[in-house]
A protein has these predicted regions:
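Amphipathic alpha-helical "stalk" segments
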Residues: 1-144
Length: 144
């Protein structure tokens, strides 16, 4: 198997895992068209785009941990985490789907569903709530 074939298999494996864990909820909330388009976008990412996505996630994690430790959902670390989260979504979602409303809706879904909440809270307890508050604050500032 070539390096490219391994990379494609790796992406497909992650898409399948994500579909199994979150697919029903995503399809219920946003529909098959958006779910399928998001999966296709992920399949189409190049190695460098995938690496960039991973780098964003690592930086998001570091900033969110710092924000929780700082205890400030509107501080520099938290707001940078919210910005990184938006950038991550733009790399993962179909082109043109991102909006402040969609970002805020997804963030609040994280709090409502333990599967989503546990992803960020595994980094540090309270991370999901800080991220959601930071996203709300960032998007409110942007609307002003």
């Amino acid at each position: 198997m070539s390096t490219e074939e391994k990379f494609e298999a790796f992406k497909q494996g992650l898409i399948d895992k994500n579909e199994k864990k979150y697919g029903a909820e995503v399809r219920k909330r946003w529909g098959d068209t958006i779910a399928d388009a998001s999966n296709e976008k992920m399949k189409g990412l190049t190695k460098s785009e995938w690496q960039h996505r991973d780098e964003i996630e690592k930086e998001l994690k570091a900033e969110l941990i710092a924000a929780v430790k700082e205890g400030n959902a509107t501080g520099t670390h938290a707001l940078h985490a919210a910005q990184l989260h938006a950038e991550y979504l733009c790399l993962s979602w179909p082109d043109g789907l991102y909006s402040a409303e969609a970002h805020r809706g997804l963030a609040h879904a994280y709090l409502a569903d333990e599967r989503f909440k546990s992803y960020y809270d595994a980094w540090i307890p309270g991370a999901t709530e800080v991220l959601v508050d930071a996203i709300d604050h960032l998007l409110s500032e942007s609307a002003d």
